[in-house]
Amino acid sequence: MIKVTLRSLADKWPSDIVARTEVKAFTGGTVSEKYMANLDSQGAGPNGRFKIGRKVAYPINELVEWLERRTVSLDE
């Protein structure tokens, strides 16, 4: 099994947090804001989410680790 590393996403992001509304941009369009909201409501989203005003955000390291756990290589 090939391990997929997404750490480069965090290295290129200009902040230590990612707003839920920016997850689509952060993941290159592979994960949408609505999908994240649905997973969060089921308790299946990344750990450590928090709110700033009306916006939900994720610590970047938690988001990357969560994405890596959910990622499967198709080149096996």
Question: PLM features: what roles do these ranges have?
Answer:
Residues 3, 26-60, 73-75:
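Major-groove DNA-recognition helix of helix-turn-helix-type DNA-binding domains
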Residues 22, 62-63:
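Short, well-ordered alpha-helical scaffold segment located
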Residues 65-76:
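DNA/chromatin major-groove-contacting recognition/catalytic segments
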Residues 2-38, 68-69:
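Polyanion-binding surface elements
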